């Protein structure tokens, strides 16, 4: 199943309103997965209960695999994010892990008509997926009047992601699921700090995936 998308004039800064969900079916060969795709914001509060910002997320939660209902309580959940810093999670979603992908040969920029197909390599076959956009990227934003110095920075960023993950688990009642975090590029540096904050908050991780790990900035500086 494939679709064609053509760019249309729209407000590039328009923020989606309330949570939006749609039931879809992924199918490749004889395999099929019924799942609910949702887009929403997570309200992130600091320890003083002051709103830091709203973190945009896209989630894919399976309801049936090959026609058989799944037990959400035991199905893993993986929280995934790109790096930058300054990148939303669109590349790792539609370019790698999500149930849908944009067709590309990877050798040139895509034309204005984009073909989107079921992704045969999606991790949805093994785990539910939640893609998180860091505050200030994608449709995530820092709350009006909130000091951005308390949000931007390695430690600050990781704390915000920790609060977002806890918020999502609370809202979806998934504390019994095996939990994973999946970071790419700078996202691996985030993960290295995030796993500590999650541990201190009592969030048990079943595993951490580091894609294109990037821990030492000095290796990429001129003269090194």
Describe the function of each predicted region.
Residues 133, 180, 207-209:
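Residue in the alpha/beta-hydrolase core beta-strand immediately N-terminal to the catalytic nucleophile
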Residues 99-103, 195-224:
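A catalytic-pocket lid/entrance helix-loop region that shapes and gates access to the active site
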Residues 173-186:
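Alpha/beta-hydrolase fold nucleophile elbow
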Residues 187-192:
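Catalytic nucleophile loop
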Residues 2-7, 49-150:
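N-terminal cap/lid subdomain of alpha/beta-hydrolase-fold enzymes
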